[in-house]
């Protein structure tokens, strides 16, 4: 997530930081009650993939997983809404009827915490990645500009390289964004594929997504794709760790592509057992989850109940502030936000908050008790 705050009310985003945001976007949009009767700012602590211990679980060669709390500033919570789900394609490779026995857990080789320079891309590293993509585009880099960390100028957060027809942004987390300077004619993915075949694979799974404001007004739309794996397990990995997002301009042309390269900069620790959907739901209802949602404020009963579950998928929680990339069951939980929203929303409109239950069994953690359902 990288602590990135994305306000639904924003009209745009600084292109300098598009690449840095690639790893955050597929976690879902951050809902902000722009016209709420009261706005509460919360500093969110999410228990996410942490260090792993070089201790093996009994009768297993898999290292135990250890978690640490990660702080990131934010206002609002992570989630989605019924309009977005209704007007967007569901391309998740998993559903409740599919049983998965094992999924890999990865060590993030680009892990970074505040002030740490080691393991973070250098300016030369970022330029090398930009050069790779400029060659794929058949162009040469004319110039580039670097952007350093706000608190440590020795850390290069982003490099933006210019070619004749493209702008290539490479973030310190390895995320890549390519802006098409001349998008005329790029009205759909078939046109993009004809012009940029290296961006596509034979087994791609494609979906179109539409986002909405808190007032129910349409915002931007985009395409997302990932390569279908030979197994469901590989497809689940690709769905989060190896995907692309194509964004439309105001004129309806496809203006840019964000390329998730996190799997390229990770190390597989092993294939870990995965609990079933029913087990995950049981843990959710028992309070064994993490979330940026304050249940007391947004759930009438103050706790998650089965009747509030609207959707579930399996994703990898990522970002260069994650030491591990590991799978989670992500539950979409209905939240009662009407007391906080003064605008007239459709009667059947619903807001959802994300609640995460680790897909790896608790015996593979040394501190599973951190998943206690408290407001993170």
Regions found by a protein language model. Give the residues of each.
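Preferential activation on post-signal-peptide N-terminal prodomains/segments
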Residues: 55-237, 241, 260-265, 375
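Disordered, charged N-terminal biogenesis/targeting segments of membrane/secreted proteins
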Residues: 1-28
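Segments that shape or occlude catalytic/ligand-binding pockets
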Residues: 183, 191-329, 333-339
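Helix N-cap / beta->alpha transition motif
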Residues: 14, 276, 356-359
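Short, flexible helical or helix-coil boundary motifs
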Residues: 17, 137, 288-291
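A short, surface-exposed beta-strand/turn
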Residues: 167-183, 234-260, 337-376
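N-terminal export and membrane-targeting signals
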Residues: 27-36
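Single-pass transmembrane signal-anchor helices and their membrane-water interface zones
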Residues: 10, 35-61
